[in-house]
Design a protein with these regions (language model features):
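Conserved N-terminal structural module of periplasmic/extracytoplasmic solute-binding proteins
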Residues: 1-99, 389-401
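Short helices/loops that flank or line small-molecule/ion binding pockets
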Residues: 76-88, 106, 163-165, 237-252, ...
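Hinge/lid segment of periplasmic solute-binding proteins
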Residues: 97-149
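Extracytoplasmic/periplasmic solute-binding protein
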Residues: 139-143, 162-208
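Glycine-centered hinge/linker elements that transmit conformational signals in sensory
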Residues: 180, 201-237
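Extracytoplasmic/periplasmic substrate-binding proteins
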Residues: 221, 226-301
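Mature extracytoplasmic/periplasmic domains
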Residues: 286-360
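Conserved C-terminal helix/tail region of periplasmic/extracytoplasmic solute-binding proteins
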Residues: 343-401
């Protein structure tokens, strides 16, 4: 018997793969679709698979609406290009309200009034926003949320004193097109714990100068805590991905998305205020993040998707801000605690400030922390550059509802 050669087997495998893809495409084409909706977001890998499995596939099955998903790590650039070309997605999911506010002011977003109950959310998650010439409207809905202001550790619980050495910290600043955001998280969180939510909200809304003493103190505190300007350490952190594993005994200032990693390491977390030098009397508020869905093309299919995302019975990935949703029974104690902080009334929560800022300011902030980390002696120049970009706006950045 003659055995097939490697080339023959390779061709056969390729044909089978193409046949399988064709069958899958044929199955999707043969479905009795009642319409379609385009969705732009930045989820990829496991995050995208989880969203498709828990949200998109059940939605398609129930409503016979084909969700055409477009994922991109350069989300802001792709969306801006699509809008400029006159071909925006029906629904876009962006990480924060600052960029969405600009699109609302430019009359690019369509109100979500009547599609869901904003009372199921803290006001700052799904606020009524007033744009020039319009009555107040709700323009976005939180799809998934994350908790920040967390310090992960193993072993002994950290304190201000034990966290004072830069060598204690695990730090990765690289994140592709958005490199620098781990550093902005530090500066923001330090300001929140040192100066409190009121000052923080004024700053995030462009009503407090970047050159203010409280803001400057946050930058210098961060530089001291992480060893800014130390050549080898700086080079390592600038080229290390934000999700890289930490060496044993290190501390990590990262959000709830790292819970799985630290659970496997046998770790725990403390609130960031416990390790920040100079934490003020209003310390203890939580910095939070979220992916927000907005409608750019108000088709019936797009509105149906928004209703589905707001339904308390929809199994959204990770953490929902919807107070009417039932707690996920499969979550471990740490995950349940995180979910409670994100949803329960009475908790002081503030948006990640850079995500609440206009896009130009946010991007400049990312670059400024990278440059400050490498050359902390040039702080005056960095703050002056950011001050020239400061724009006042009116967003509910903090809340306790």
């Amino acid at each position: 018997m003659t055995r097939p050669g490697a080339r023959t087997l390779g061709i056969l495998c390729a044909c089978l793969v193409l046949l399988g893809a064709g069958v899958f495409a044929g199955v999707r084409w043969a479905r009795d679709w009642q319409g379609s909706v385009t969705l732009l977001a930045n989820w990829s890998g496991d995050e995208r698979e989880q969203f498709e499995e828990r949200v998109i596939e059940p939605f398609e099955e129930e409503y016979r609406i084909d969700v055409v998903y477009q994922g991109s790590s350069a989300l802001s650039q792709v969306l801006a290009a699509d809008i400029a070309a006159g071909n925006p997605p029906d629904v876009a999911v962006l990480p924060g309200p600052g960029e969405l506010l600009a699109y609302a002011v430019d009359d690019r977003l369509h109100p979500l009034d009547g599609l869901f109950d904003p009372g199921h959310y803290d006001r700052f998650w799904a606020p009524e926003v007033t744009v020039p010439g319009e009555a107040p409207h709700t323009y976005w809905l939180p799809v998934k949320t994350g908790l920040k202001s967390m310090v992960w550790y193993t072993g002994q619980r950290p304190t201000v004193q034990s966290a004072a050495s830069p060598n204690r910290w695990c730090l990765g600043m690289e994140s592709g097109a958005t490199s620098g955001w781990p550093g902005t998280d530090w500066v923001e969180d330090i300001l929140l714990q040192q100066a409190g939510p009121r000052v923080y909200e004024e700053w995030a809304n462009g009503r407090l100068p970047w050159t203010d003493d409280a803001v400057r103190k946050a930058w210098t505190t961060w530089a001291d805590m992480v060893g800014a300007g130390a050549g080898e350490r700086v080079e390592q952190a600038l080229t290390t991905g934000f999700g890289a594993d930490c060496a044993p005994g290190r501390l990590e200032h990262q959000g709830s998305f790292r819970a799985g990693h630290w659970r496997q390491a046998g770790g725990d977390h403390v609130h960031f205020s416990e390790v920040v030098p100079g934490a003020g009397p209003d310390a203890g508020a939580w910095e939070v993040s979220g992916d927000l869905a907005a409608v750019l093309n108000p088709t019936p299919e797009a509105e149906r998707l928004i209703r589905y995302l707001a339904d308390p019975g929809t199994a959204l990935p990770e953490y929902t801000a919807n107070r009417a949703a039932k707690a996920d029974g499969e979550q471990d104690p740490t995950e349940r605690e995180i979910g409670a902080v994100l949803r329960e009334p009475g908790r002081a929560r503030c948006w990640d400030a850079s995500d609440a800022m206009p896009r130009t300011t946010r991007d400049a902030f990312h670059q400024a922390v990278l440059r400050h980390f490498a050359a902390p002696e040039e702080l005056d120049e960095r703050l002056a550059e950011l001050e020239r970009l400061r724009e006042e706006q009116d967003l509910p950045v903090c809340g306790t509802d």
